[in-house]
């Protein structure tokens, strides 16, 4: 991914927190030179000094079979993004787009049945445990679980390279930066308001 120096993020902990908060990613592989992608909720864990991404495909999704021929995988994550009008700058310029994006490259392998059950248990806990009536793995009937496991294929990806870009108007002067925040706050688009919040948070960390 092309990343100008202003926008490059290298803090591993910061990136890891980002992908866990924006865990609906895009898994990209190739088959005979043709890219294939699936959008999936993903899990994350760290063992020793290595990071892993976990997830599962529907059995009927042919993409999982590409892991057998090609282990190399790209996983993409995206945060809020927003259009930035150059009318918000103090000097003439062209419009642009602010965004957060992380690309992770790695080697994929398939999960065994017990590993898949563990991955699903953790995922359900993440999204359900805070609810009034949480749907947790150990609360579901064995018959239902067995049926569901037959319909999906689990995988894990050992992360080998991480590229992260947070384009948050870091290349603008203070006046322009503050005005971009104000203008984004006035936009009706929820993404724009989230982008304004991110830019404010970044500014506070610099103070």
Swiss-Prot record:
| Top-level taxon of origin | Bacteria
Has the keyword Ribonucleoprotein been applied to this entry? no
GO biological process terms on file: sporulation resulting in formation of a cellular spore
Alphabetized, the UniProt keywords read:
Sporulation
Matches recorded under Pfam families: FMN_bind_2 (PF04299)
Give the matching Gene3D superfamilies.
Electron Transport, Fmn-binding Protein, Chain A
Q: Where is the signal peptide?
A: none
Under the heading InterPro entries, the entry gives: Split_barrel_FMN-bd, TR_PAI2-type
Biological role: Involved in the reduction of extracellular and cell-associated protease levels, as well as in the reduced levels of alpha-amylase, levansucrase, alkaline phosphatase and sporulation inhibition, when present in high copy number.
Question: What protein family does this chain belong to?
Answer: Belongs to the PaiB family.
Q: What is this protein called?
A: Protease synthase and sporulation protein PAI 2
What would be the name of the gene that encodes this protein? paiB
């Amino acid at each position: 991914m092309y990343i100008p120096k202003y926008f490059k993020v290298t803090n591993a902990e910061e990136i890891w927190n980002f992908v866990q908060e924006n865990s609906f990613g895009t898994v990209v592989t190739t088959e005979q030179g043709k890219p294939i992608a699936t959008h999936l909720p993903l899990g994350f864990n760290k063992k020793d000094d290595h990071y892993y991404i976990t997830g599962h495909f529907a059995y009927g999704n042919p993409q999982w079979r590409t892991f057998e021929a090609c282990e190399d995988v790209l996983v993409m994550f995206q945060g809020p993004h927003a259009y930035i009008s150059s009318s918000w700058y103090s000097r003439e310029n062209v419009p642009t787009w602010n965004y957060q994006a992380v690309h992770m490259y790695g080697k994929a392998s398939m999960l065994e049945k017990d590993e898949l059950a563990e991955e699903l248990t953790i995922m359900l806990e993440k999204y359900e445990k805070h609810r009034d009536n949480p749907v947790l793995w150990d609360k579901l009937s064995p018959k239902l679980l067995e049926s569901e496991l037959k319909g999906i294929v689990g995988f894990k990806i050992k992360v080998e390279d991480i590229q992260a870009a947070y384009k948050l108007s870091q290349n603008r002067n203070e006046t322009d930066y503050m005005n971009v925040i104000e203008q984004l706050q006035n936009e009706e688009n929820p993404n724009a308001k989230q982008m304004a919040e991110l830019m404010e948070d970044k500014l506070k960390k610099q103070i």
